[in-house]
Amino acid sequence: MTRSLKKNPFVANHLLEKIEKLNMKEEKEIIVTWSRASTIIPTMIGHTIAIHNGKEHLPIYITDRMVGHKLGEFAPTLTFRGHARNDNKSRR
């Protein structure tokens, strides 16, 4: 279910403050965050945000096509290591 249009998109306050400060300075630096639930808004475009995936922070460059999505969508938490090998040969 989508979020009500009456409500604003969720963005963590600390993240919003950091982005506004960088926009006023017109500087580019990596913003480190654990807030995977924050929605990408147009003021974030052009910034690099390091999103925590549970183990490390992955730097993600924000483009205009990402607006409206959540930050966590771009930092996968699980790595697929392949299916279990078939051990029929070792059983013989």
UniProtKB/Swiss-Prot annotation:
Annotated Gene Ontology cellular component terms: chloroplast; mitochondrial small ribosomal subunit
Stored Pfam families: Ribosomal_S19
GO biological process, one term: ribosomal small subunit assembly
Gene Ontology terms, MF aspect: rRNA binding; structural constituent of ribosome
Stored InterPro entries: Ribosomal_uS19, Ribosomal_uS19_bac-type, Ribosomal_uS19_CS, Ribosomal_uS19_SF
SUPFAM superfamilies given in the database record: Ribosomal protein S19 (SSF54570)
Subcellular location as annotated: Plastid, Chloroplast
Keyword list, A-Z: Chloroplast, Plastid, Ribonucleoprotein, Ribosomal protein, RNA-binding, rRNA-binding
Family per similarity comment: Belongs to the universal ribosomal protein uS19 family.
Protein purpose: Protein S19 forms a complex with S13 that binds strongly to the 16S ribosomal RNA.
Name recorded for this polypeptide: Small ribosomal subunit protein uS19c
Top-level taxonomy: Eukaryota, Viridiplantae, Streptophyta, Embryophyta, Tracheophyta
Gene: rps19
